[in-house]
Design a protein with these regions (language model features):
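Conserved alpha/beta-hydrolase "acid-adjacent" motif
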Residues: 118-124
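Conserved alpha/beta-hydrolase catalytic His-Asp/Glu region
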Residues: 34-36, 51-103
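Flexible "cap/lid" loop of the alpha/beta hydrolase fold
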Residues: 14-15, 19-50
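Catalytic histidine-centered segment of alpha/beta-hydrolase-like enzymes
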Residues: 143-155
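Short beta-strand/loop motif that positions the catalytic acidic residue
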Residues: 105, 111-113
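Catalytic histidine neighborhood in serine/cysteine hydrolases
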Residues: 125, 129-146
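Gly/Ala-rich beta-loop-alpha elbow adjacent to hydrolase catalytic centers
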Residues: 1-5, 9
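C-terminal alpha-helix
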Residues: 155, 159-167
Length: 167
């Protein structure tokens, strides 16, 4: 799971310790920020309408460092998200924390974080690794948030297959 998807995966693993044998989490934030939470509604509330403009979406897209050939899909998907849903996703993402049950997870979990990500992401990766008994952490050189699975899908799949073959 990547980012918000990774939070959902970790939540599932904390509730159902034997749901899977292997899992990958990439760029997952587990350090809650009440300040960020409080800023999301006013910030996105006032500028949400801009995402419908391609020029603005291109700026946003560029900041995410996603392969350029994925822009049309990104634009379509982003425009389809309602304002209230976008705010809810971002707010929940900003206050997520690991649950105690995560320590009982039976899956082998590979944790990836980009070398060029924010410190909070790197710290989150370490926290996840410390809480999960059977986990491995890898800092990906020269990569930003979510770049591994999105921009390097072939390498990502290779790593996934390596994890499965190890057992």
């Amino acid at each position: 799971g990547l980012s918000l998807g990774g939070q959902i995966l970790l939540e599932t693993l904390s509730q159902r310790k034997d749901i899977c044998k292997y899992a990958i989490v990439e760029s997952v934030l587990v350090i809650p920020s009440k300040f960020t939470y409080s800023m999301i509604k006013p910030a996105f509330g006032s500028c949400y309408g801009l995402i419908k403009y391609k020029w603005f979406s291109k700026l946003q897209f560029k900041s995410l460092r996603i392969k350029s050939n994925l822009f049309d899909e990104y634009y379509k998907d982003t425009c389809a998200i309602r304002k209230s849903d976008m705010i809810a996703f971002l707010q929940e993402n900003s206050v997520y924390s690991l649950k105690d049950g995560i320590g009982e997870c039976e899956a082998t979990v590979q944790i990836y974080v980009g070398e060029k990500e924010k410190q909070s992401m790197k710290k989150s990766a370490k926290i996840i690794h410390e809480k999960l008994q059977d986990s491995f952490i890898q800092v990906l050189p020269n990569m930003y948030h979510g770049e591994f699975s999105i921009n390097h899908a072939d390498d990502y799949v290779r790593k996934l297959l390596e994890i499965v073959k190890r057992r």
